[in-house]
Amino acid sequence: MNATPANATTPVESKDIGFIGLGNMGGPMAANLVKAGHRVTGYDLLPEAVEAAAQTGVRPAASAAEAVAGAELVFTMLPTGRHVLGLYTDGGLLAAARPGTLFVDSSTIDVADARAAHDAARAAGHRALDAPVSGGVFGAEAATLTFMAGGEAAEFAQAEPVLTAMGRKIVHCGPAGSGQAAKICNNMILGISMIAISEAFVLGESLGLSQQALYDVASTSSGQCWALTVNCPVPGPVPASPANHDYRPGFAAPLMAKDLGLAANAIREGGVDAALGLRAAELYAAFAEGRGAGEDFSGIIRAIQERSGRDTSTADRSAGTPGGGAV
């Protein structure tokens, strides 16, 4: 495994890039490629997404095939493996690209689908990487994503200088599918962590502990983690967290449910004893189908509060120092 920090001071040769999927993640990623001096042609099924990307310098295409014609690299950021494979094959994306094009799929999909996409690209005379990301919309906008890449070393070496325009950390995880494997495992850690933190805040409140006091202890002790210090599920301690903005997503709960579903499938198929991963998948699936459909994944604390018979406003109501202190 090779890990490379992005270096914005290193000149990067300008590339012709096609970008398919210009939504909440793909749009900012394509914009950062333009900022880095690349020539980007983009397409999305939603005209408003294409129009928004055009405002950032992305050349709009009337079809996916038009977006990839003449491209040296093609990025895809799509909802599921079914969408990726369908676009590659039945959608004609591989056929429309010039021979030897490098396809980089940054969607979060099943490992088997990632390997199938890689094989389809190779069979059509192209090269491929699976390169999902971590960092959410904020990371996409700030060009601070982590890329987890799976594929051959030569393909990674070609893509790496381009990935640095969108990410802060670029990791070559191994052969095809390894990037998706890393993403699934990472988000299983994240989902379990958020549930544990949320349960701890609800338990602490029931014991008369203020949310700020628990944060002050856990954030400087062995309980410290990203889900606490960056995406804290209660309002007050971390002003930029979604909890302070009515749980408007950064990383939407349905996306966490999707990723944990992929992890649960892999757990079952691999015969792995991962009880917490399976339970986290169940909890997020239920949350995403209900009140969490439009919320950040940290909003799961309100589901835990409801099941515990607590007030779901999440304001710091418990004894001790009130919430709202500085980080």
Predicted regions, residues:
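Rossmann-fold dinucleotide-binding core
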Residues: 17, 87-89, 109-187
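Hydrophobic beta-strand scaffold residues
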Residues: 40, 60, 128-129, 170, ...
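Helical "substrate-binding/catalytic lid" subdomain
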Residues: 179-279, 283-308
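NAD(P)+-binding Rossmann beta1-loop-alpha1 motif at the extreme N-terminus of oxidoreductases
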Residues: 2-77, 96, 101, 106, ...
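Rossmann-fold NAD(P) dinucleotide-binding segment
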Residues: 64-127
